[in-house]
Each structure stands twice: as C-alpha cells, then as structure tokens.
UniProtKB/Swiss-Prot annotation:
Molecular function via GO: cholesterol 24-hydroxylase activity; heme binding; iron ion binding; steroid hydroxylase activity; testosterone 16-beta-hydroxylase activity; testosterone 6-beta-hydroxylase activity
Reported consequences of knocking out the gene: Mutant mice are deficient in spatial, associative and motor learning.
Coiled coil ranges: none
Cofactor dependency: heme
Localisation per UniProt entry: Endoplasmic reticulum membrane; Microsome membrane; Postsynapse; Presynapse
Protein name: Cholesterol 24-hydroxylase
Family statement drawn from the similarity comment of this UniProt entry: Belongs to the cytochrome P450 family.
Pathway(s) per entry: Steroid metabolism; cholesterol degradation; Lipid metabolism; C21-steroid hormone metabolism
Distribution of this protein across tissues and organs: Expressed in high level in the pyramidal cells of the hippocampus, Purkinje cells of the cerebellum, and neuronal cell bodies in layers II/III, V, and VI of the cortex. Expressed in hippocampal and cerebellar interneurons, in retinal ganglion cells, and in a subset of retinal cells localized to the inner nuclear layer (at protein level).
Pfam families documented for this protein: p450
Membrane topology: Single-pass membrane protein
Entry's transmembrane regions: 3-23
Annotated keywords: Cell projection, Cholesterol metabolism, Endoplasmic reticulum, Heme, Iron, Lipid metabolism, Membrane, Metal-binding, Microsome, Monooxygenase, Oxidoreductase, Steroid metabolism, Sterol metabolism, Synapse, Transmembrane, Transmembrane helix
Amino acid sequence: MSPGLLLLGSAVLLAFGLCCTFVHRARSRYEHIPGPPRPSFLLGHLPYFWKKDEDCGRVLQDVFLDWAKKYGPVVRVNVFYKTSVIVTSPESVKKFLMSTKYNKDSKMYRALQTVFGERLFGQGLVSECDYGRWYKQRKVMDLAFSRSSLVSLMETFNEKAEQLVEILEAKADGQTPVSMQDMLTCATIDILAKAAFGMETSMLLGAQKPLSQAVKVMLEGISASRNTLAKFMPGKRKQLREIRESIRLLRQVGKDWVQRRREALKRGEDMPADILTQILKAEEGAQDDEVLLDNFVTFFIAGHETSANHLAFTVMELSRQPEIVARLQAEVDEVVGSKRHLDYEDLGRLQYLSQVLKESLRLYPPAWGTFRLLEEETLIDGVRVPGNTPLLFSTYVMGRMDTYFEDPLTFNPDRFGPGAPKPRFTYFPFSLGHRSCIGQQFAQMEVKVVMAKLLQRIEFRLVPGQRFGLQEQATLKPLDPVLCTLRPRGWQPAPPPPPC
C-alpha cells in the first residue's frame, strides 16, 4: 500500500473514531432514561422511523405511542448525536405547556423556518421561538380573533360552505367518486383567503391551480426535508427544484396581496380588522417585509391545512358510524332546519356536533403536538433529564393511551358529553398555554358550519378500498383521499320499471 493511501486510511479511521467518541459522549448524559434499544450506533433510533409502515397508515407518532406504552411517561429518543425526550404525563404537560418559562426549541422548528434553503415560515407566529419577539406579534394578532371579529366572519363561512355543498349536490348521483380531501381543502383555502386576507381564490371553482399545486408540493417538501441527505441525492434534484419554486410562488402571492392592501389603504378605503391588517400593523416600521411574509405563509398554510384535514378525518370516520350520523342529522334538523344560513347562536346549540368534532381531534389531530426546550436539569416524573434537552409533547400519543381514555381506539363522542369528566392535560389538539393556537376559535366555527351544512343536505359513503390510516406531511392527514359517493339527504332509489 502506498504511503498516500495509508495516510488517507489512517485519517478516515481517526475521523470515524472521533465521530464515535463524540456521539458516545453526547448520549452518555441520557443513558439512564428509559428507551428502546438502538438498532444503529451512529443512527440511533432513526431506523425505527423508516420502518413505521406508512403505507399501512402508521405514522411516526404511532412509534412514539408504542414506546410510551412500553417504557413509561419519560422516553429517550436518539438520532445521531442528538437526544430528545418524549413526555406523556398530564402533570408534566401542565408544567411545561402552561408556563411561559419554557420556550419552543428553535432547533426543532428550523425545518419549518427554512426548507431546502428557501425561507418558508421564517420568524412567523408558529416558528418564532424567542418569547419577546413572539409576544409582540401575538399581542397585535389577537385583535383579528376577538369575538366581534369572529362573529362577523359567519357570512364568509356560510357563503363558502354553501358553495361547497352546491358543488357536491351536483355530483351526488350515488355513483361518481368524489375526493372529499380535495374538496374540503379547496373550501378551507377559499374561506381562509377571504376571511383573513380579503381575497377571492375560487379554488372550489377550479381557479388558482398553480397556487393549489404549489401548496401541495410545499407541504410534501416539509416532509421530504426531514431526510437530511435528500439535498445530496441526484435523484431528488427535480423534486427539490419544484419545492423551492413552490415556496417562492407562495411568498410572491403574499407580496402581491400585501401590496394590494397597502394601495387600498393609501386610497383611503375602509379595510376590515382582519389578519392581513394585523400582520401589517405587527411589522409597521420594519426594514423589509420578510417577517410580514413569514406570517402570511404561516396563516395561509396553518389556517386552511389543519381545518381541511380535520374535516376529512371526520367525514372518513363518520362513513363507518351510521348511528352517530343519524344523531348528528337529527340535531342539525332540529337546530338548523332547512335554512341555508347558520347564525352564530346556532353553533352553540349544536352540542353533539361539537362532541363529534372533539372526538375526531382526539383520534386524528392534524397538529400532533409541540416541543419545548428544557434549559436546566429537571426531575420529570422521577427521571432526571439533563438541561438543553428538547421535550416532545404529543396529543396524538396521549389521546390513544388507555391510561387516559377508556377504549381509546373506539370513536365515542360521548367522552365529551355534558356530564362526562373533562380530560385534563391529556387532550391538546390546539396546544395549551400562551403558545396555544391563536386561530382555534376561527377553526372550530369554520368546521362546524361546513359539517352542519354537509349533514343537512348530503349523505356520503366511502368508496370500497379506502383505508383508515394516516400519513404525515406538515400535518397529519388521511392516508387516502377520502373518496366518497354522495347522495342528497332523503334520496330514494327509483322504483323498478313495471314488468312488460
């Protein structure tokens, strides 16, 4: 062997040895914490993530659920040299999510801030981890979600939900398969665009196809970015280019809409105190529009994607729950009757529908959970956890544990009935505390109006072969597109022709 090759081999071995030593030392602080065996020294638990059987509808949260059941309320997760801790006790959820002392972990939110080199959510309301900067934004944004502002949005909720139902009625022949996931996504984008930004996207009418495709590709990109090696793989170049172009298109749409609003304000036109107005106020005096666009993207994506998936999961589950559907239809008939416009007061009277939507979020939360950074060593449920550790809190995991919910995989809306005990710090589909979702009341009103109108006038049946699993992109969504055949309420088959 030549001296050069020998020197190169020695350098590689030395680098590998140093790498192994670094990984070992980084993990040694956590070895006392319960957790599954590592299938790979360098990769840690990463191979488990790859074997989660997503084709069968299992997602990463199902892996974490298995570990929480087996190893207890504090579980160690190793990926390369990094360690996170899954926490699944109500006491710890209360302690860490309800206190302003514990911030989001910036390392865990980088995948949302920038995707393959393109700024996506940046320093928007969801991904901003500095409490001071976040609080400044949140204080201004809260004005767009006051009770009076939300009540004023009922007109938009009704208008777009009515348009959705009319389109579905035209397809309700009992035979034509309809992707409810796609239709509900179009509806929630149209609602969000008008309610939050004063814009008509007309997705339900087939307009804005480039924007619709860009949103789809961008969401796939967030999922793809979790593969740290993707940007180095030649076969991924086309996909990465499309992801970057989609993000640029989405931010350009934001620039255009912001410019239109600014021009309208200069002309002295009256503008609603909507989300776009508050975004402009929050960044008044800023040197550039980057953070403003961060919040545009944040509200545009988070404001429609989670609601669309919540509705799609609910339709999917109700397709196999005829008794629950009958109760829902009876309630809608009593509260809403035949009127086409739901009033704000109607929403509070749709008690059973509220229970169904809550139970849907328990089993199928689009936003599965959140992270907090533990800055100092702390005893958590009797386990010493070192400082500078990301803590993972999952409403998906806790919502499916029989420790907290009886028969957790059974869809039972009566868990949330008036006389039922309230789940305390085991159910948090909108997170908890000061970092809870700013738009949760908006979302709950929106999905209630849409579901009430669907139940009032449409019967849906899942096409055979559709699976009840999940997939993970930026959020959790149904594995299949929730293909349904539709019929108008009260539809009866035509009588057979008389015999000749």
